[in-house]
Amino acid sequence: MTKLSVNINKIATLRNARGGNVPDLLKVAADIQRFGGQGITIHPRPDERHIRYQDARDLKAIVTTEYNIEGNPQHNFIDLVLECKPDQVTLVPDAIGAITSSAGWDTIKNQEYLKEVIQEFQRNGIRTSIFVDPVLEMIEGAKKTGTDRIELYTEAFAHQYDLGNKNGIDPYVKAAELANELGLGINAGHDLSLDNIQFFKQNIPGLLEVSIGHALISEALYLGLDNVVNMYLKKLK
């Protein structure tokens, strides 16, 4: 079964819109796990516009499943991850001020830097994953960084699926097959939803984990958080 890690950035966005502590991020994280979620993902950004660095620290005691911290490995982020020691760190090349992630790493151009950062995290017992596009050269480059896993950036698949083009899965299948051959674990995320997750899961060999936030929280507004988490779990079996 592919594990479901729920990204709770949108909960923090809602909280920060009014100040105070409603909704309570820590309670939501605890409830998601109680409902069956198998992990919690956060993506703190330098401006702390949704997840705050203190949230990352506070969640350490709350997350009893798998704790995944995503972000661009700048100095402050590296320090935060080493302090919190999550189960997994996912390295994402997002620009400062970006609304959301928009591309994977160039694992050839950034290979030496990624290798250095990955080794630091691994020395501290943290599993590493790097965000990549479904491009075979980037998968090969990822292997050379020493990362434990890759996270396939699934925006292109989701867009094509919405248009009715199921062939949009093809590059992801090839990327996953190569990753499996190279011994890389496979995660995936970005624009996955109740509409497309089952098709994606059924076609990607060796898919270990998906990280879903925006769609899941949006769907929960209509269907309820407990219900939506379990709907995803059924589709990921």
Swiss-Prot record:
Lineage top rank: taxon: Bacteria
Active-site positions on this chain: 43, 70, 190
Function: Catalyzes the complicated ring closure reaction between the two acyclic compounds 1-deoxy-D-xylulose-5-phosphate (DXP) and 3-amino-2-oxopropyl phosphate (1-amino-acetone-3-phosphate or AAP) to form pyridoxine 5'-phosphate (PNP) and inorganic phosphate.
InterPro entries tied to this protein: Aldolase_TIM (IPR013785), PyrdxlP_synth_PdxJ (IPR004569), Pyridoxine-5'_phos_synth (IPR036130)
Protein name: Pyridoxine 5'-phosphate synthase
Location in the cell: Cytoplasm
Pathway: Cofactor biosynthesis; pyridoxine 5'-phosphate biosynthesis; pyridoxine 5'-phosphate from D-erythrose 4-phosphate: step 5/5
Organism per entry: Flavobacterium johnsoniae (strain ATCC 17061 / DSM 2064 / JCM 8514 / BCRC 14874 / CCUG 350202 / NBRC 14942 / NCIMB 11054 / UW101)
CDD domains with a match to the protein in the record: PNPsynthase
Alphabetic keyword roster: Cytoplasm, Pyridoxine biosynthesis, Transferase
Similarity section: Belongs to the PNP synthase family.
The EC number(s) this enzyme carries: 2.6.99.2
Binding site for 3-amino-2-oxopropyl phosphate: 7, 18, 191, 213-214
Record-linked HAMAP family: PdxJ
GO CC annotations, alphabetized: cytosol
GO molecular function: pyridoxine 5'-phosphate synthase activity
Site residues by UniProt (Transition state stabilizer): 151
GO BP annotations, alphabetical order: pyridoxine biosynthetic process
Catalysed reactions listed for this entry: 3-amino-2-oxopropyl phosphate + 1-deoxy-D-xylulose 5-phosphate = pyridoxine 5'-phosphate + phosphate + 2 H2O + H(+)
Subunit structure: Homooctamer; tetramer of dimers.
Sites where the protein binds 1-deoxy-D-xylulose 5-phosphate: 45, 50, 100
Matches recorded under NCBIfam families: pdxJ, PRK05265.1-3, PRK05265.1-4
